[in-house]
Amino acid sequence: SISEKIRCNAKVNDNLLRQAQALYKNRFIDLKPFNGKMPPDWQLGTVSEIIELHDSKRIPLSSRERANLTKIYPYYGATSVMDYVDRYLFDGIYLLLGEDGTVVDDKGFPILQYVEGKFWVNNHAHIITGKNGFTVETLYLLFSLTNVRSIVTGAVQPKISQANLNNVSVVIPSKVELSTFNSIVQPIFSQIRNLRAESDRLTSTRDILLPRLMSGEIDAANIQL
């Protein structure tokens, strides 16, 4: 069924992501290819040296403002798609990292969204791309394996500020090493994006067909997917 295929795609993507995380951990955290020692052309630095923040382009829209908009492009909040709107602020592949509200999981790792295409973001998520050899995909893996509980402020409304995020210590591999790693993980993330796009199409198809199937307007036996 359509629902089973969507679930299968999600399971495959989870497995692909775990594979990519294992590759990152082996190479850049455990340093297994380098006998556990950081190569001399790598350096210790901070997140500010490897990310570009696009937070200044964010524009929050109230639920009232969104109510009459045609539902075309995803409208992201700190943790997920909150709504759909008829315009977009960004177009491309970006990493969203929760800024306030729910910003870490129960183990202290940041709430991340790997997004692509045309979309809008409210002011509750940091919008990130990479620099100095770091791609969005490599940043996703880095942050998914970095506990950030210590930089969260605010008891009532948890927050990860730009300043605290930028000051997180990181290992910065050489650009050659980053390029080599990127060539390995890009096909994995390409497959993740393709499966996610397929699931989105299947979800749209299901949402269109289901009411017509339930009403008897169309016969399930005549459907070809």
Residue ranges and their predicted role:
Residues 39, 43-173, 224-225:
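DNA target-recognition domains and sequence-specific DNA-contacting regions of bacterial/archaeal
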Residues 1-60, 65-77, 171, 175-221:
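Non-catalytic DNA-recognition/assembly elements of restriction-modification systems
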